[in-house]
Curated annotation (Swiss-Prot):
It comes from Aeropyrum pernix (strain ATCC 700893 / DSM 11879 / JCM 9820 / NBRC 100138 / K1). This is UPF0175 protein APE_0890a.1. Signal peptide: none annotated. Belongs to the UPF0175 family. Transmembrane segments: none annotated.
Length: 79
């Protein structure tokens, strides 16, 4: 059974921006890095497509899969 928890945090207004999205993303990345959820589940928790989540991981220099770019191209048969 899944349930949601609401967490209230006081943040100075000049830092707010799109804080809900940022917090969800940070939490999803953290869960992924700790091996608690898969990359697919983390993307879902962040409210992002898998592609967009992978782009975000790459931007943060986080490896989503244990392959180098060359190994991944070989595995997928891409030249």
């Amino acid at each position: 059974m899944s349930r949601e928890v609401v967490v209230k945090v006081k943040v100075p207004s000049h830092y707010v921006g799109d804080i809900e999205r940022e917090v969800k993303l940070a939490y999803a990345v953290d869960l992924f890095l700790r091996g608690i959820v898969s990359v697919e589940r983390a993307a879902e928790l962040a409210g992002m497509s898998l592609y967009d989540f992978l782009v975000e991981l790459r931007r943060r220099r986080i490896q989503a899969y244990p392959y180098s770019d060359e190994e991944l191209r070989e595995e997928l048969g891409i030249e």
